[in-house]
Structures are given as structure tokens and as C-alpha cells.
Amino acid sequence: MINIQNTILGKIVDRKHEELAARLKQRNLQDVEELAKAATPVRGFANALQHKRPGVIAEIKKASPSKGIIRADFNPAEIAQQYEQAGAACLSVLTDVDFFQGADENIAIARNHCALPALRKDFLVDPYNVVEARALHADCILLIVACLSDQQLEEMSKTAFEHQLDVLVEVHDEEELERALKLSEQCLLGVNNRNLKTFDVDLNTTIRLKKLLPASRLLITESGIATPDDVRMMQEHDIHSFLVGESFMKQPRPDQAFTALFGQPQTV
């Protein structure tokens, strides 16, 4: 397991524990469960991803810790509509406030303006955050193996499935992949090509880890997909699912940036 102390991820996780304590004081788990029950029906995230080739999770992100403001003109509703028209399979919506300038309400805003399912992109540290994701109308959650123990991964994925949420489990290396594979095969697997310590991106990370999986297991490549050549390289290694944010968010028209990178995805 990567040691995340003294990394930006470590700082984020520390902040998330503080945030969790504050949120529990504002609203207990029982109240959040009631909100989750009243949320809009779940849209199948994994199903949508599997039925597009390439299957693209298009990200709605205003800022990042490494780049600062990525998109000053930030309109989640408009971006969601553009992504849907361009052929995205799913959305990824940042809800972290302190590091990514996201907001909880952006999930509902994005979903209300398109028919795509949405991932709550955040750094979840407790089952409370999972139930909260459903209360915010998310269809899928992200579990980052580097941030969580095996027990947390098991408990949080179980909570997600109990609430009809799909689960994307993110790994950075072989050791984390081994841990992720202990979880239900229902979980989607994602490889983040960005080194947590250096922030360098190496697309070969996904290709290397793909070889350790059964051919039937869907794998999502995350971070650093910036050119059609990057996309082709992944497809040549039978990787057809992508999570892309920054490449789209930096451009005036995210839909045009999407088409330039992926062409027109086909339903399969």
C-alpha cells in the first residue's frame, strides 16, 4: 500500500475525517438514510458504461490541487448537456469543496439536465459518505484503495450495493489491485495513471495492470488521456473505458473536446 502521509492525498483524507465529524453533527445517519430513500431512482452506471464503445466517464471539475482553477466559466448543467450530446456514457461530478471547488448540489444539477448516470467523485472515508452519495442523487461512488483499509473497502462497497449504487474502485499499482480483487466482482475497477507522490502520469500503468486481470473484467483508465493516440494505445490493449476530465474542462467547448478525442462512441 502506498504511504499517503506527506502527500496531497494524505492531506485530503485528513480533511475528510474532519468534514465527516462536522457532517455527523449536522445530520445523523438515520436522517441521511431517509434522504437516500427519497432520492431520484438510480440510473445504472456500470450498465451504461458497458454499453458504449468507447465508454467514457466525462468529468465535471472546476479546479484541482495541482492545477488550481481549470475552468473559470463553470456551469455544471450546461457541461452535462454537452457531454450527453457528445456521446458520454456517464458523468463524474466533483463534490469536494476545499481542494477541487466542487459542491454537493452539482450532482443533482448535472443529472437534472441530462439522462446520464453520475459518479460522486470525492474522497469517501466512511459508510456515512456512501449513504450521503445516494441522498445527493449519485448513481455510483468512488473508493480509493490508497485511502482505505480492506475492512473499510468491504464495508463501504457493501453499503453501496445495499443502496443500489455502483462502485468504482481506484488503484495505482499491483498491490492495490490485489486488494481490490478481494472485493465483489460487481465492483468496477479503475487505474489512476498518476503517481500519488510525484504526480507524474504514466499511461503504461493501466496497460501493465490490465495483464493481471481476466479478459472479461472491465477496466477503466483514469488520468492523462489527452490525445487520440492515447485512446488508440489503450484500445490496442483491449481497454475501452475512460475517465477524462481535465482535457475537456480546459477547452471552451467540452463537447467539441470530447469529439476530438473520442469521435462518436457507439452503443454496443
Swiss-Prot record:
Answer yes or no on keyword Translocase. no
- Top-rank taxon of the source lineage equals Bacteria
The Gene Ontology terms for molecular function here are:
indole-3-glycerol-phosphate synthase activity; phosphoribosylanthranilate isomerase activity
Which reactions does this protein catalyse?
1-(2-carboxyphenylamino)-1-deoxy-D-ribulose 5-phosphate + H(+) = (1S,2R)-1-C-(indol-3-yl)glycerol 3-phosphate + CO2 + H2O
Q: Which gene encodes it?
A: trpC
Pathway participation? Amino-acid biosynthesis; L-tryptophan biosynthesis; L-tryptophan from chorismate: step 4/5
PROSITE patterns in the record = IGPS (PS00614)
EC number annotated for this UniProt entry = 4.1.1.48
Q: Which family does it belong to?
A: Belongs to the TrpC family.
Task: Check the record and name the Pfam families matching this protein.
Answer: IGPS (PF00218)
Q: Which UniProt keywords apply?
A: Amino-acid biosynthesis, Aromatic amino acid biosynthesis, Decarboxylase, Lyase, Tryptophan biosynthesis
Enzyme class, one word?
A: lyase
Q: Which Gene3D superfamilies match?
A: Aldolase class I
Q: What is this protein called?
A: Indole-3-glycerol phosphate synthase
Which PANTHER family does its entry note? INDOLE-3-GLYCEROL-PHOSPHATE SYNTHASE (PTHR22854:SF2), TRYPTOPHAN BIOSYNTHESIS PROTEIN (PTHR22854)
Q: What are its GO biological-process terms?
A: L-tryptophan biosynthetic process
Q: Sorted alphabetically, which InterPro entries does this protein's record hold?
A: Aldolase_TIM, Indole-3-glycerol_P_synth, Indole-3-glycerol_P_synth_dom, Indole-3-GlycerolPSynthase_CS, RibuloseP-bd_barrel
Q: What is the lineage of its organism?
A: Bacteria, Pseudomonadati, Pseudomonadota, Gammaproteobacteria, Moraxellales
Organism per entry: Acinetobacter baumannii (strain ATCC 17978 / DSM 105126 / CIP 53.77 / LMG 1025 / NCDC KC755 / 5377)
